[in-house]
Amino acid sequence: MRLSYRLVSGLLVLASIVGMSFALYLEHVKGLEPCPLCIFQRVGLMAMGFVALIAFLHNPVSNAIKRFYAFLAGVAILWSVGVAGRHVWLQHLPPDQVPSCGPGLNYLIDALPMKTVLQEVLSGSGECAAIDWTFLGQSLPVWSLAYFLLLLLVCLWQLFRFYPVFKTAKK
């Protein structure tokens, strides 16, 4: 069975919706407060979903445009992979090396320039090292990293897979 570009783009949109729905479920139903790194992971997931939605709706014929959309989606989810990897690393630091807790993300955004906010958030804080939820012995950032890596593989497959070239008939 050959998976069409549009079908895979639709599956990426669906995967983004599922991931965000689960994150919002954990936040609003289970009461888990997302740390700044969690929020940044969501941004990458939503950006990938947005690019995939545009690709799904546009359904380009040009292979170059298909690859461009796949590249943009891959870059977006690569952001989430990087942030989730940093999050996992912070959670595995020895307790004496965990950074102290910093101010909340809303305060940082209101008080500091965006470049400084990015530096502060990506350096992590003590709240990001706390493990509040586990499944099968793994923390939420580990599961998020695995999910994002799977989505990155799909984006890379979309980027590098063979697309048949359709030649138009001459009249």
Swiss-Prot record:
Required for disulfide bond formation in some periplasmic proteins. Acts by oxidizing the DsbA protein. PANTHER family: DISULFIDE BOND FORMATION PROTEIN B (PTHR36570:SF3). The chain crosses the membrane at residues 9-25, 44-60, 68-85, 143-161. Residues 26-43, 86-142 are periplasmic. The keyword Zinc-finger does not apply. Belongs to the DsbB family. It is found in: Cell inner membrane. Disulfide bonds join 35-38, 101-128. One of its GO terms (cellular component) is plasma membrane. Keywords: Cell inner membrane, Cell membrane, Chaperone, Disulfide bond, Electron transport, Membrane, Oxidoreductase, Redox-active center, Transmembrane, Transmembrane helix, Transport. GO terms for biological process: protein folding. It is a multi-pass membrane protein. The keyword Cell membrane applies. This is Disulfide bond formation protein B. Residues 1-8, 61-67, 162-171 are cytoplasmic. One of its GO terms (molecular function) is electron transfer activity. InterPro entries: DiS_bond_form_DsbB/BdbC, Disulphide_bond_form_DsbB, DsbB, DsbB-like_sf. The lineage of its organism: Bacteria, Pseudomonadati, Pseudomonadota, Gammaproteobacteria, Moraxellales. It comes from Acinetobacter baumannii (strain ATCC 17978 / DSM 105126 / CIP 53.77 / LMG 1025 / NCDC KC755 / 5377).
